[in-house]
Amino acid sequence: MAFLKKSLFLVLFLGLATLSICEEEKRETEEEEYNQEEDDKSEEKRFLSLIPHAINAVSTLVHHFG
């Protein structure tokens, strides 16, 4: 009977340890995804801020050569 208790405690301990590791990896993955989304948003903002400058440059060229 004592052997079964020890085995059960071992199984429960290993299960909890595995669950803890999985939760930590999940949190890290979610954090990396969030950081990637933030990087993508900042790149998009930088790109969108260049559009007015490009339009001004094109309009200047059109007025100069047109």
From Swiss-Prot:
GO CC annotation terms, alphabetical: extracellular region
Family: Belongs to the frog skin active peptide (FSAP) family. Phylloseptin subfamily.
Gene name of this polypeptide: psn2
Protein localization: Secreted
The UniProt record lists the keyword Nucleotide-binding: no
Any single Pfam family the record assigns to this protein: FSAP_sig_propep
InterPro entries documented for this protein: Frog_antimicrobial_propeptide, FSAP
Modification type Phenylalanine amide: residues: 65
Signal peptide: 1-22
Entry protein name: Phylloseptin-H2
Maturation-removed propeptide residues: 23-44
Source species: Pithecopus hypochondrialis (Orange-legged leaf frog)
